[in-house]
Regions:
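Conserved N-terminal beta-strand and adjoining loop/helix that marks the start
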Residues: 1-27, 48-49, 81, 102
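Residue-level preference for beta-strand/loop junctions
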Residues: 8, 37, 93-97
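Short, well-ordered strand-loop elements centered on a beta-strand within folded domains, enriched
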Residues: 22-31, 109-113, 155-160
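Conserved Nudix-box catalytic region and its N-terminal flanking loop in Nudix hydrolases
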Residues: 23-66
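Glycine-rich, flexible loop/turn motifs
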Residues: 37-39, 45, 78, 117, ...
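Residue-level detector of functionally special positions within alpha-helical transmembrane segments
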Residues: 39, 44, 125, 147-149
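Unchanged
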Residues: 48-74, 80-139
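Charged phosphate-binding loop/patch that engages nucleotide di/tri-phosphates or the phosphate backbone
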Residues: 143-171
Length: 171
């Protein structure tokens, strides 16, 4: 009997950040009609890496497709790489490697481009996120909030969802 091979799915996430008063805010989209985490406030820009594409190009392309923004690859600040397992239950036939970036500079005004997939777009203070944020994204946003407050830096590599544990590799 042969066991099925699992897939490794790479994705790029881009956290768009701005200062509002004395707080750092992140842009989140309300997911709908996707079959995954619908009703959750998720990263404003995220998507799978296409064949032959780097994660930097993916993040820039997704910013244009999802929000109508031009974000130059050189404006992307690497945050962390996350290796994660199935986070919705059932057999884990795939694993994911998510590359998280942030940016504070872009061209254009963010607007929902994919209205069938995203119901709303809002800025949230990092210390006042909505209740429903995908768990792996909430973890990264929490580490970022700690770093920006002068605490420990975001770990460069993390694992998430393996037997319900989060682990960090920070040297």
């Amino acid at each position: 009997m042969t066991s099925p091979r699992f897939s490794l799915v790479p994705a790029a996430y881009l956290l768009l950040l701005r200062e509002h008063g004395n707080r750092t805010e992140v842009l989140l989209q309300l997911r709908q009609n996707t079959g995954y985490m619908d009703g959750y406030w998720a990263c404003g820009v995220a998507g799978h890496v296409e064949p032959g594409e780097s994660v930097l190009v993916t993040a820039s392309r997704e910013a244009e497709e999802e929000l109508g923004l031009h974000v130059a690859p050189e404006a992307l600040v690497p945050l962390t790489a996350m290796h994660r397992s199935n986070d919705v239950g059932g057999a884990a036939l795939e694993q994911r490697v998510d590359f998280f970036f942030s940016a504070r500079h872009w061209e254009g005004e963010p607007r929902v481009q994919e209205k069938t997939k995203n119901a709303d777009l809002q800025w949230f203070a990092l210390d006042s996120l909505p209740m429903r944020v995908p768990p792996h994204e909430r973890a990264v946003l929490g580490w970022l909030r700690t770093q920006l407050a002068g605490g420990a830096p975001v770990p460069p590599v993390v694992v998430f969802g393996f037997d319900g544990e989060v682990g960090c590799g920070d040297g």
